[in-house]
Amino acid sequence: MGPDETLFRDHLESDAFLAGTARGKWRLHEGPEDIVWPNPIFWIQSAKEFSPSGGVFLRFDLQNYPQQAPTSCPWNVQSNTRLDYKEWPKGGGNVSRVFNSGWNGSALYAPCDRIAMVRHETWATIHSAWWWKSSFTFVRYLEFVHNCLNPAGHEEKGT
Amino acid sequence: MKTIEIFVTTVGAAAPKRLQLELEATVADLLKAAHANGEIEPGGEMLVFLEDEDEPLHHSRKLGDCAVQERAFLHCHKCRHISVTVNYNGTKEKKFAPSVTVARVLKWALKEFGLSGQDAEDKVLRTDAKGQPLEPGTHIGTLVARSCSLALYLTPLVLVEG
């Protein structure tokens, strides 16, 4: 097991990750023993208006974690393939900006995603809290996506 | 004896600390355990709140008797209330318990300023007008170290674009 995977598995036991799991914000898909490195899959909660199932699975690429930023792609865990673009989360705020299959069909348009960070250096200032640093853990990426899909001021329609 | 896992936050802590305690343990035991792990400054009266609850828990009560359940989130703070001021197109003020989340303060502020729908969805709270947006799950008690007052700014969400 390489140092990236070893560190990732340590972070799976971190209080920050487990607190989010306890809140129902996210969870690891299947068990730690099922991880096919470097591609763990996480489920992240979403307001149903943005994702009717109430969440989205993301398949990560954590090669050289955490020196290299993560990248992730919405995933269909039944077929084990990229989620059909029609099923990607959609909505206002940053939802359709971050889940933008028209930009790149295999990554999120996010300041903590290594593919999106390329040629977006201005985000290091504008989105400094989210711009990936090697001191971050993958929980920071999960937080970004969770905040995007669950704006605190959002109220589910019909409630 | 049944053991439960709980998450405790306090002043200055970025993330809650996970603790395992018996249901028979008292709130004072909880404080001691949290202190043993370095989360709480020694000395002085420390209050313990359940998340989003207004009343502190009595130190002599057992966790199992005061609705502290598996995976509960608690907050330790010296302030009984935090006087929160939110600035937008005016100022609104209200006292909240330290264990209240930023999300709850935001919902209150949106209502006070008459914002709903898209106008509400793209708003976030910050501790200064140009700072980073606060995480919705953050307990407001973590944002004030010494005083029992907190000034916040209701601002638009910064979009990911460019």
Predicted regions and their residues:
Chain B
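Ubiquitin system architectures
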Residues: 1-162
